[in-house]
Amino acid sequence: MAHDTLYAIGEALIDMIPSKTGCSFAEVPSFSPRVGGAPANVCGAYARLGGDSALLTQLGDDPFGHKIIDELAACGIDTSHICLTDKANTALAFVSLEADGNRTFSFYRKPSADLLYAPEQVDTSLFANAYALHFCSVALVESPMREAHKTAIAAARSAGTIIDFDPNLRFPLWPDRDALRRTVLEFLPLADVVKISDEELEFLTGTSDIEAALPSLFVGHVQLVLYTCGNAGAHAYTRTAHGFSASKPVKAVDTTGAGDGFIGSFLWQLHKNGVDRAALPALQADQLNQWLDFSNRFCGYSVQRYGAIDSYPTIDQL
């Protein structure tokens, strides 16, 4: 059986996008609901480019939960493994947009339905047809969902699936910063691919110098580190090669989901070029440069539009 599908485990939620930018939440007259959540976004980016993707999560059996399922399915994402519950509601994230497109979040998630997703709900047989498993730190707070991650990661490791981790730090969701750091550093060695941003590097590694940080990132199973720096471009490192792509200036209106689009489009390129887990250590600089260029173009298109999945381009639009 071919290993084709990207699975992502974690949250799917509603991003409430403000109608007015450059102001506080109190000054926003209205919000528009858009489907989001980092794992869902990564599936969306992969699917928009023509790949097979599926989300492993749980939503509330409520209007927002059904909206998410309907819209993800319309994007080509396999939603058949999404569970519904009446024990909690679908998560909401209210977004505040600055004039430059950067954002802050206010979450309604104590707990939300996704955090109640339990290990026994993970169908481990799915990984026989998996290309990659993607996860983030948002769903790794103490909860059944955290344990479900461990079950999925172990099954993916046994099946030969590429495991990708984007810490995607969201400090307001954690009791304290030390708990978040400890959790990320616990899960990081379980991944083959790690994506980290310049805004996260010093918090997680103690240094803002990526070259100095690499020894603390190449731990456990990690073979590829993607380092994104916004307007300053993006880097990719194996233990022996380095790639870089400069960003082209664009007028950003909303950066929501940009990092998710980057990793989703990069994973799509790995799959398109037949890169399996065993091939990661041998990737060359010219390959990395080419794939970084593509993902930068993907993100450049996305940030000029509002929302996350809604803003992602197809291959023809690039």
Region roles according to the model:
Residues 1-78, 117:
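Glycine-rich phosphate/adenosyl-contacting loop at the front of the ribokinase-like
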Residues 1-7, 154, 208-318:
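Conserved phosphate-binding/catalytic region of the ribokinase-like
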Residues 44, 92-96, 233-236:
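Short beta-strand scaffold segments in enzyme catalytic cores
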Residues 46, 197, 259:
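Short, conserved phosphate/pyrophosphate- and ester-handling motifs at nucleotide-, phospho-/glycolipid
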Residues 52-135, 318:
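Conserved N-terminal subdomain of the carbohydrate kinase-like
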Residues 125-126, 186-187, 218:
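Structural alpha-helical scaffold elements that stabilize or flank donor/cofactor-binding regions
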Residues 131, 192, 223:
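Receiver (REC) domain switch/active-site residues of two-component response regulators
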Residues 138-215, 232-233:
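Conserved beta-alpha-beta core of the PfkB/ribokinase-like small-molecule kinase fold
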